[in-house]
């Protein structure tokens, strides 16, 4: 179950970074992910360094990046980002300012505000998914 393992990795990352109000976005949330899709998270912090320090506290190696995000049809902004892995699953984080939680970027698919799921919503998605088939039963 591809989505299940990707969403579980997302949930682990979201729980470890809970103080930054994480939101799952993109193909893993929408159900269109492939085995090569990264888990995409939006975090909210005064500075990206605080997120990096939290990853260091958890012993998670990471890479600092920058992400260009379309906030409206005519406005593209650059935000700091981080890349790391949880259980061999690539995680791509974009760090927005604290007030960024109120305005989602526009979706590259349909131009509407991007759907975001908080930890509770991701847990509910996982509960609604069938368990992987086990040959032991």
Describe the role of every protein-language-model region:
Residues 10-55:
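Active-site nucleotide-donor binding segment shared across nucleotidyl transfer reactions
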Residues 27-28, 83, 100, 124:
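Residue-level preference for alpha-helix termini and adjacent loops
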Residues 49-67:
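Hydrophobic-cavity lipid-handling domains and compact docking modules
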Residues 49-51, 92, 101-103:
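Residue-level signal for secondary-structure boundary sites
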Residues 61-98:
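Conserved catalytic core of two-metal-ion nucleotidyltransferases
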Residues 95-137:
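Catalytic cores of NTP-dependent nucleotidyl/adenyl transfer enzymes across multiple folds
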């Amino acid at each position: 179950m591809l989505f299940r393992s990707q969403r579980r990795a997302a949930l682990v990352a979201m729980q470890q970074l809970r103080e930054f109000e994480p939101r799952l976005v993109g193909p893993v949330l929408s159900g269109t992910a492939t085995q090569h899709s990264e888990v995409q998270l939006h975090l909210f912090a005064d500075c990206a360094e605080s997120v990096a320090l939290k990853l260091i506290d958890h012993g998670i190696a990471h890479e600092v990046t920058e992400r260009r995000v379309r906030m409206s049809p005519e406005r593209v902004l650059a935000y700091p980002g981080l890349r790391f892995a949880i259980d061999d699953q690539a995680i791509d984080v974009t760090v927005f300012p604290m007030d960024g939680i109120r305005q989602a970027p526009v979706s590259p698919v349909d131009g509407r505000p991007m759907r975001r799921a908080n930890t509770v919503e991701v847990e509910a998605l996982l509960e609604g998914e069938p368990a992987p088939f086990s040959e032991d039963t």
